[in-house]
Amino acid sequence: MGIKKMFKKKDPTEGEIRDELTQIGVTTKSDNKTRQEKFGAFKNYAQDRQNAKPGFQPVNPYANVNAGNGNGNPYAQQEAGGDGDGEAMGGNNSSPYDKTTNPYGSRSERANNPYGNGNVGASSRGERAGGRNTQTNPYGGARASGRASGSKPNPYGGVQNDGALADDTESINTAVTGYADPYGNETARASRQSTRRPRAYDEESLDLNAIPSHQAYTPSKPIKRTQMRDDETLDLNDLPEEEDLNLDVDELPEQEQVDSEDDEVEAIKQDIRFIKQESVGSTRNTLRMAQEADASATNTLGMMGSQSERLYNAESNLLLADTQSKIADQKVKDLKRYNRSIFVPAYGNPFNKKSRLRQQEMQIKADKAQEKYLRDTNRKEMYASEQRIKQGISQNATSSDVHQKYRSERDLEAAQRYQFENDSEDDEMEKELANNLDQIGLYSKKLQSSAKTMGNEVDSQNKRLGQIEEDADRLDINVHMNSARLNNIR
């Protein structure tokens, strides 16, 4: 056995196979000639973002507020078994916000209202471990229980409240207000309606979607001003003179007309300034969002460039695998011929040896030319994709300083048509407004160009993916056929 192993032919190594293929002119994969990635930073950024641990990502602390792990609302209504904070020795540490009831609830909920009518027996804060000292509500009605043992009498309980014997309207109004009149029947008879506004009124009067109006938008009318002379005395009982709303501006005195016109001019100036400031703020926000969109588009283009590089690597590997598959096919045919019977000669016809050699050379040339053509085609597609993405990324959304100076002067001249008593601040706002609008327009053009570049790149990569799919299917079939031929060799 040892001698047999000694003379057994060893399997060739990968380096020996590669050297042999290189000698016969077959292209092999070289680890030293790796193509430098120009969009590798985008690929690394995407991989780091995908492989980021959940602990490093921002966590919302309010995500599980309603979970059943005890992190619920501490002020929610709970059905505690104690009497609130009135028990000093009972050991019940219930929340002071428990058993909260709606004071505006229905009539069935009036028993839970601590400030309801006098029929409610509230637990006292003076309750101890020995017994219950019930203390009534000092602001309750005349029918509040003041005769319990140890209880303090109501100082207003002597007056009998006959309002409880009135109709249901008074009792409902008393329940809505949340407390009875402590001064007895006289006040109850005087006012039978609640002074509290219903909830529907508050909901109708409060509009959360209403836009707050600015004082500059409030139209100012000419106001008739009365100036007090030095010899006049101040009479506190004197009624102010009524304003005549039908009075025309032309009928006012000259000084008052001048004052009203000055007020109107000042209000118009304030309106212009306020609207201009709002416009500048809007353009700033729009420019910021345009810059964010441009950064997102640049990142997307970079990711597509990295994807194009990986597609090129896949195409090169498939081309190399196809070449190796053809060589394997030829080797399988030779092995099948050598494995024939000893009675059938393995060598061919000696009379057509030259023609066979010439045919093999032509086949090698054709395979090499086809391989070179496919490699050049893949390289051209990769170069075109790289140039498209570089052009989309390197587009500049800003202009030169000379162009900016020329544009600012032209914008100031154009703004003179609708400016009114402008100062340096107005000129600066006009410059910023015009500059922001120009930048927004340039960013819009760049985004449009980036979108077109993305569309063209996506179409090109889709075609390349289709070609890769076809090559992979053909390679799979060839490998499967070679495996079947090897299995059939006996």
Swiss-Prot record:
UniProt GO cellular component terms: plasma membrane; SNARE complex
Compositionally biased residues, Low complexity: 58-80, 140-151
PROSITE patterns linked: T_SNARE
Record's compositionally biased regions (Polar residues): 94-105, 392-401
SMART domains noted in UniProt: t_SNARE
Gene Ontology molecular function, alphabetical: SNAP receptor activity; syntaxin binding
Region (Disordered): 1-244, 389-410
Domain of life, per lineage: Eukaryota
Official protein name in the record: Protein transport protein SEC9
